[in-house]
Amino acid sequence: MNDSPGRTTVSGPSGGSDPFRVMVVDDSAVIRGLITRALESDPEIKVVASVANGQMAINTLSRQPIDVIVLDIEMPVLDGLSALPHLLQADPNVKIVMASTLTAKGADISLRALRAGAADYIPKPSSTRELTGADTFKRELTEKVKALGAAARRSGPRREGTAAARPPGAAAQPTSGYTLPSPVRAKPETGPLTVRPLPPDGRPDVIAIGSSTGGPQALFEVLGHLRGATQPILITQHMPATFTTILADHITRQCGIQCAEAKDGEPIVGGRAYVAPGDFHFLVVNRNGVPTVQLTKDAPENFCRPAVDPMLRSIVRQWGRRVLSVILTGMGHDGQKGCESVVQAGGVVIGQDEATSVVWGMPGAVATAGLCSAILPLKEIGPFIQKIAARRAA
């Protein structure tokens, strides 16, 4: 997989505290063992529970503190999607990573789980042989678990036993809409962030969004406010192939915006949203005066393909100062270099704030670099974009 969120320096358990506590949930004992060994190859992670189905996970979570759960989707007795709301009810601060196969069905269920409150997902290799030799999978898994483990501990103290979850079938949770994962509480800052002046007038000609860990949930929230926007909306979310196809479909159905994976050579049209397809960089080129999609297999940037930086650089070449760039929750610093190009051209950058980011890596990078004209809670970003997008053209 070339869509890894990249190598992120994640603060481990501080002050000599225990390693991050993880529960692995999978009906295959072999897979549980392989995932456990991959996780425990990192000294900052300890697998404290390994169970075979969702019901066992619920029972275990009610008895001991867990920071992160790696949750399989398809299991007997109680599957991952059905167990998810009960796990979050038992401990709203626990971070859940859905482990999914690289299939359309797996991608669809993973995105439904993200809408229901899962913090992230990870595509599993399709066989134990692939899993045994998948160094990229192991690296991505350990990085996500450490980042989300740190987030869980900032969200609230881990208890020596959580409130017992309501058994499945009793007073079922509502399934409409979507649930944002528990936000990460802001850490004390070393100093105030520098915010750039917002241009007093002028309307952007394009809206560009970059995101990674926690991104799908954030995208649904933001794009729900932009269904009337006349600008094209270009999105790079760190995801593998198949998942990006399903993400575009979910955006269309959830947000009321016509959205699809970007296709090489197609003209970019206002009022539509385009998602970078997995394993391709999404660029914009000028063909006979028409902004046009160009997909490339150029080397990953920031260990990512698709990556936000090349998309933003190409957008600046096409639209100059008429670019509005939005960096949402995600690991790493992808998007920072591209936002530097946006600012140098006279465009505007918006970053998600730390308190509402699942992981404040990407938005934190642009915020601490002084590139943002606004650093906002997630629920304020959509209305803010809507206001700027509706300005009169200068």
Curated annotation (Swiss-Prot):
Residues 21-139 form the Response regulatory domain. It is found in: Cytoplasm. Coiled coil: none annotated. Residues 148-201 are annotated as: Disordered. Phosphorylated by CheA. Phosphorylation of the N-terminal regulatory domain activates the methylesterase activity. The active site is at 212, 238, 334. It catalyses: [protein]-L-glutamate 5-O-methyl ester + H2O = L-glutamyl-[protein] + methanol + H(+); L-glutaminyl-[protein] + H2O = L-glutamyl-[protein] + NH4(+). It is an enzyme of class 3 (hydrolase). Residues 162-172 have a biased composition (Low complexity). The modification 4-aspartylphosphate is found at residue 72. Keywords: Chemotaxis, Cytoplasm, Hydrolase, Phosphoprotein. NCBIfam families: PRK00742.1. This is Protein-glutamate methylesterase/protein-glutamine glutaminase of group 2 operon. It comes from Rhodospirillum centenum (strain ATCC 51521 / SW).
